[in-house]
């Protein structure tokens, strides 16, 4: 069988356009209503969910590329697929189906749903791979494009010393890059109900000072299936405990119900049972310790030569699954939304400007912005 030739675009880099997406998570709609019926039966449900989510994922990509035809490459903040720890080829087939992914590079991040199976590594050949941050799916990597140095960390591995080694190696490879951008899956500064105040921020106390020390400009995140943009943040300069998750007894997944203090080994219940006063106190102490940031005093949607770091969290680009926003917006959040619609961001990067515009796709296929344009300007 002879296939049609594909066209691959190598675009100009004086102004780089990046499509930034979160959590396509192909297959996650299984068990959720589809045309009035829930896909709860094991037989056939996974394939149907993969088909439906793949269709929606393709629609998002086609919409983004029609709106911005000169996209240089795509950044996915993780959870390409849904089926944690199991073979998931039907989900990867649907993820990779869109024609747009055959025309530009795609920089994927290992999410918690990708992490515990080697399938991810069979599909993505990442540049400058390291032996840091390894799980079954792979580890940290980095690359340069245009005026940016991009560092991708597998934060499903909680060894922050290894992630710091990756950042050090990456910065040494391109020390003059104007922009230093990190992509991680878990949103250490997010605003979703399911993750932002529990497992999402598990590495916040450890990664915040590391990002500060290497002058990172922007951190792109996923995981929480909501949209948020922070104020400009930097560490508070204090010493905080480190935290991690550990695998469950059979090693099939992480114990998401407990965080562990790295130094003491203390187990912290993230959802204490009613009446568990000790557990509630441990959780409160964990959350208080994660107030390890300082909010920079800036105004408006354009900042010039900021000291702090911008943290973005992308909502699901396919719409396969959404979460609620946390009840009380955190003080570090500048804007957030959950409109139960697929969304994506277009990043425009030059040697002096880093601009983010975020859109959602309405049911009729048109788009509208869900946040003001946010711009970082560098003059030095």
PLM regions: where:
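Acidic, histidine-bearing metal-coordination/catalytic regions of metal-dependent phosphoesterases
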Residues: 1-46, 304, 322-327, 340, ...
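Extended active-site neighborhood of metal-dependent phosphoesterases/phosphodiesterases
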Residues: 1-6, 10, 33, 41, ...
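Active-site neighborhood of phospho(di)ester-bond hydrolases with catalytic His/Asp-centered motifs
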Residues: 20-22, 73-79, 105-112, 153-154, ...
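Acidic/histidine-rich helix-loop elements
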Residues: 20-59, 125-133, 190-197, 322-337
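Solvent-exposed loop/turn segments at secondary-structure junctions
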Residues: 24-28, 80-84, 112-116, 147-150, ...
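Core catalytic region of metal-dependent phosphoesterases/phosphodiesterases
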Residues: 54-116
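C-terminal or late-domain output modules
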Residues: 59, 63, 67, 102, ...
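Short acidic, glycine-rich surface-loop motifs adjacent to enzyme active sites
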Residues: 77-81, 174-194
